[in-house]
Amino acid sequence: MEKDYKNTLNLPKTDLPMKAGLPNKEPEILSFWDSINLYNLIREENAKKDKFILHDGPPYANGDIHLGHSVNKILKDIVIKTKTLQGFDAPYVPGWDCHGLPIELNVEKKFGRDSDTVKDKSKFISACREYALSQIENQKKDFIRLGVLGDWENSYKSLDSSFEADTVRSLGRIVTNGHLQKGEKPVHFCYDCKSALAEAEVEYEDKVSKSIDVGFKVKKDSLIKLSAAFSKEIDSCSFVIWTTTPWTIPANAAVSIGPELKYTLCSSKFGNLILASDLIDQCSERWGEDLEKISEAKGSDIKDVVLEHPYLKRDSILVHGDHVTTETGTGCVHTAPAHGVDDHNICKKFNIETIHALDGNGFFNAEYEGLAGLPAIKADNIVIDILNDSGALINAEDFHHSYPYCWRHKTPLIFASTPQWFISMDKSGLLEGSIQAVKDVEWEPSWGYERIKSMLEGRPDWCISRQRSWGVPIPLIINKKTGEIHPKQNLLFNEIADRIDEQGLEAWDKANLKDLIDDHDEYIKATDTLDVWFDSGSTHFCVLDKLYGKDLIADLYLEGSDQHRGWFQSSLLTGIAINGKAPYKAVLTHGFVVDENGRKQSKSLGNVVSPQKVCNNLGADILRLWVASTDFRSEMVATDEILKQVADQYRRIRNTFRFMMGNLNDFNDDSKNINQNDLVEIDKWIISAAIKLDEEVKNLNDSYAYHHVVQKIHNFCVHELGGIYLDIIKDRMYVTKSDSHARNSAQFALFEVADILIRLISPILVFTAEEIWQSHDLFKKQSKSVFLCPKKSLNKIESSISDDDWKVIFAVKDSVNQNIEKARADSVIKGSLD
């Protein structure tokens, strides 16, 4: 009878299953972490170490998390866990942005616009707060499911009364430092939001508008001066403007020309016209009209000229402006100070009054016949008809261009002057200080510096006021007659903030001026709320200062690349305005998630990859591995097929660990008592290779090159382990005596390599790393969790065989294997053992 030798072999045995079953296993591990209070244990373990602070940019508390949220939170978690392994105390306090219009709209949708809940401001605020909190709970569950470890029970929320109070205090500091000003500067206005928008809330899309060329007739009294400028007697003449916003013509107050440009007097079927010399051919082609040149003059010589509004009985002043170019149009710029920044600035310079054709909601005032009550964006064709009837219209045609849209409603905006509160970029040197500060910040990728610098250089004053209910109040006390802020306002900020801390943001509505100031009859309370970008932008003051002290600057801000114009910028501006310094030492950005065709994910395209579905079907570790293995600095392609490929990559890593753990089933404290100098040389080699891998990964982690980290670890599992070492030691592991030196040497090496590898994968494959850690007593003896494991000291192993010698040995091995394969293919041998 043939003997069964199976029982004489040291066959692998492990509790680590081949099939991961992550969707079921991961929730069990989450429960385990919760039961041991893992986050707090990590804090206690690292309390005396140097801190590394990654400050969480707050997601908006509305709707389910999407793949972009997952990318952001997973990257942050990888950073935090990596820094913890490197010996830092790296706390993570997540946060949420909770005020603003989207929440208001959802509450209105739930209760109805005409409901008592919506009409009663106090009830409305309570409903908004309740809604935001419910959204936070939903998002929090999904973030935790991703394996993101943080102080979830003490997260910061911009709706917390303490946060709202600190937001008011931060505004107080900014006002005290001289950065606030009131004005009627033109700002982007959204009809759907019924409010002004900040630059960060504006998107640009292609739009077809009506472009018009309009003649502004020179008043008779100015013809003599005009004739002198052109050295030609002129009895009648018009300056021609070009604009893509016909609806702004009723608000025209001036026409701007370039002082350094040349202008030509031409004759045409429309009469004598003046336009920039460089644009005559362009205008002639656009109008289908031959223009006969009569005379030329320099812009600076054309002065003290007054024009007639094309159809309204008022003057339009001709002014010189350096903003005028000859890129397109006529070189004569229609100037409506209520509807353009350049227009506003040039009219302010020449003391020209701003004309308000629109009311505070963007509708034409009653005195504008034919337009009264109309929204500006629907007035273009009517204005064109009026201009045509008046004989001032020269040309009208469609014009394709990039136009500002509301980022929430995807509807076109108007640029309109409304009374607002601004943080001035020039007053008290805020812009200059910000541009200087970004030079000292580490930007990753490096192009981030040029991007934010160019955005700062071109940005207008920051409009921080909103006409909403659900937001932190701007608690200013304003003189009824002069509009000036109360002289004691700087002191009042703290008193008002204390009330908000106790009662919530409703405290400002409840506040009676009698209780705040003596001269209360002369003052009123401001009713505006703060831009939500101010809320999130002041978190360094409201959160970090409280948690870690006023001198701390965050080591890292990590968000999507769109935040150069959003959170990075608002945080920078408030940081400079409050403390005179940037709130971060380094800024790291990631790209957007797209499909295989480079398109953003959207339900309408059917290309959405749901993080919840990935967790339920494949497991969060697969999602985490995809994030880590993708170069996140660029656009990140996510499809079901790519995730399947990532799952295959995961299986190779897992099976490598499973083989190692299977052969360590009887490895214990006694087995570990082996002198490293006595190890078999190949065992020394694999430990040395793992130590080298550890060093390489550490350097890659320092530069956040996680895709290279994954590549290195995967290649090590496939090549050094799977392709060389594990294959070589199989016979030694299976057939030598269980307590033999040869087997103990291999087991010692396997344990050392596994101990190194498990730490390297733990920031990425958090659930799998914990599962492996819990599968062996020697790991569990080190710590309750892989995330509590002490820093491993890696000592170089002395070997009689050099790295170069090993290269020769492995080259010979490969050559022999190739010849064996050839012999097998040629049927010379049946197998390698022959």
What are these language model-derived features?
Residues E2-D15, K19-L22, E28, F32-I36, ...:
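Residue patterns forming the tRNA-binding/recognition surfaces of aminoacyl-tRNA synthetases
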Residues L30, V175-K207, Q282-A297, I302, ...:
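Amphipathic alpha-helical
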Residues E44-N106, T167, I241-I249, L318-I346, ...:
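N-terminal catalytic cores of NTP/NDP-binding nucleotidyl/phosphoryl-transfer enzymes
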Residues N46, D50-D56, L67-V71, L75, ...:
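Secondary-structure capping and boundary motifs in well-ordered enzyme cores
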Residues N46-A47, G57-P58, P91-E104, S155-S162, ...:
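Short, solvent-exposed turn/loop segments enriched in Gly/Ser/Thr/Pro and often Arg
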Residues K81-D89, K110-K121, K141, R145-G150, ...:
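Secondary-structure transition/capping motifs at alpha-helix termini
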Residues D97, V187, Y191, L197-E205, ...:
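Acidic, turn-prone loop/beta-hairpin segments
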Residues V218, F350-G362, R468-W470, I478-K480, ...:
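Alpha-helical recognition segments enriched in aromatics with Gly/Pro capping
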